[in-house]
Regions:
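Short, charged/polar, Gly/Pro-enriched secondary-structure boundary elements
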Residues: 279-289
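Metal-dependent DNA phosphodiester-chemistry modules and their immediately adjacent helices/loops
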Residues: 290-332
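Polar, S/T/G-rich
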Residues: 3-261, 268, 312-314, 319-321, ...
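Short alpha-helix capping/helix-loop boundary micro-motifs
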Residues: 376-385
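Hydrophobic residues embedded in beta-strands of well-ordered beta-sheets
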Residues: 270-273
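Surface-exposed fibrous attachment elements
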Residues: 14-15, 279-281, 305
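Short, low-complexity, polar/charged sequence segments that are solvent-exposed and flexible
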Residues: 57-59, 113-114, 286, 292-295, ...
Length: 390
């Protein structure tokens, strides 16, 4: 509909970035003021080193071996205790995301699996999924965040410097109003609900401000099973696998979530009602009895009209590096017809941070292109009866 087209155009503009956010989420940073991202769905990410220390001694306290720095690792055999610091061990607290998350697995060290033979006996780590009531120590809280506590034993053949670490994170657990339960999910509607209501990193809206009936309908539509391509496998209509940068505005992050599921969020009668764009039967017939103001019509413009759309997305099949999906395909009947009609290449490129499936990315490229070529909008002032078209 027209409302979803306008919302999509705003989100498209936000998706045109000069920087490469998708590649940046795999980078390790060192800071105590860096923003902590929110992970929805599943993504491979780097993290923020909030604690880095070297040591070569250990303490024995209460019969339990503890790292000198205060970490409490899983049980393992240690070298002989030394009275002289050797800086043989590097300790890192690597914050990955806001907690609580479902799981942190499949660690890679300098782009090699943690289990690689070159790292044998050199690395140990603890996983902290973190709910808001947990903390590391009384002095080092890290409360409410998901992080790794890691120890590296120095080996010049294995490590040329401070190791870069990435992990596969299944992110936030989400409340589902359809089942009144909380569990991990990659459903975009549930992600949007969480972002709108979360008081730590989201908008902090009261639950009463969300129409959970409408949101449940949207969530069910996102879960619809579709065939990804002729003769291919089936999958969900929409999923959300996003790393949200919490330094961005709430509006920008919400638009990122909405664009990935072709959603829009009208506000009516004191509540937000999530809608997922799609074909539907006509719901209202306008007559002159409903029109109480002037009519304005805006047609498509060359600056907003495309004959090729490229969507950049993080691809798990390419080790989560940025990949592209293009519509229409080069040499296709559609491309030939559009180029003949326009006489020049009109291309658009956007980044999608929520989609990690090639076929979902390609389908969204198709939808955005078709909308741009049928972008006539009409504005009229009407009676309150038209509110049912929200």
């Amino acid at each position: 509909g027209a409302a979803s087209y306008v919302a999509a155009k705003k989100a498209q503009k936000a998706a045109k970035r000069p920087n490469d956010d998708q590649r940046g989420v795999l980078v390790n940073k060192e800071s105590n003021i860096e923003q902590i991202p929110v992970i929805y769905g599943e993504r491979r990410v780097g993290g923020v080193r909030v604690f880095v220390s070297t040591d070569g001694t250990k303490l024995i306290a209460g019969g339990l071996t503890r790292w000198q720095s205060g970490w409490e690792p899983e049980s393992e055999v240690y070298d002989t205790v030394s009275d002289t610091p050797t800086n043989e061990y590097l300790y890192i607290a690597l914050v990955l995301a806001e907690g609580e998350v479902e799981s942190i697995t499949d660690l890679e060290i300098n782009e090699l699996p943690f289990t690689h033979a070159k790292y044998s006996g050199l690395i140990s780590y603890n996983v902290y999924l973190r709910n808001v009531n947990e903390f590391w120590t009384a002095d080092h809280r890290l409360r409410g965040v998901a992080f790794l506590g890691m120890r590296f034993k120095w080996d010049e053949e294995a490590f040329a410097g401070v190791p870069d670490v990435t992990a596969l994170v299944k992110g936030k657990k989400l409340y589902d109003p359809r089942t009144a339960s909380t569990a991990w999910s990659d459903n975009p509607a549930l992600c949007i609900r969480d972002y709108l209501t979360n008081t730590r990193y989201g908008k902090g809206l009261a639950v009463s401000a969300i129409d959970d009936v409408a949101l449940g309908i949207a969530a069910t539509k996102c879960d619809d099973s579709v065939t990804e391509y002729t003769g291919g496998a089936t999958g969900k209509l929409f999923t959300c696998n996003a790393v949200l940068d919490t330094s961005k505005t709430l509006f920008d992050n919400l638009n990122i979530l909405l664009l990935g599921c072709r959603g829009f969020l009208p506000y009516s009668q004191g509540q937000y009602r999530l809608k997922i764009d799609g074909s539907s039967a006509s719901q209202f017939a306008f007559t002159t009895d409903h029109i109480i103001g002037g009519i304005s019509i805006q047609g498509e413009s060359k600056s907003d009209k495309y004959n090729r759309v490229t969507v950049k997305f993080p691809n798990p099949d390419a080790n989560w590096q940025p990949d592209t999906a293009i519509w229409p395909a080069a040499g296709s009947t559609e491309e030939t017809a559009y180029l003949a009609a326009d006489g020049v290449l009109l291309q658009e490129e956007i980044e999608l941070d929520t989609i990690t499936n090639y076929y979902q990315a390609r389908d969204l490229a198709r939808i955005l292109l078709l909308r741009s070529r049928n972008g006539i909008t009409c504005g009229i002032k009407v009676t309150s009866e038209a509110l049912q078209l929200e």
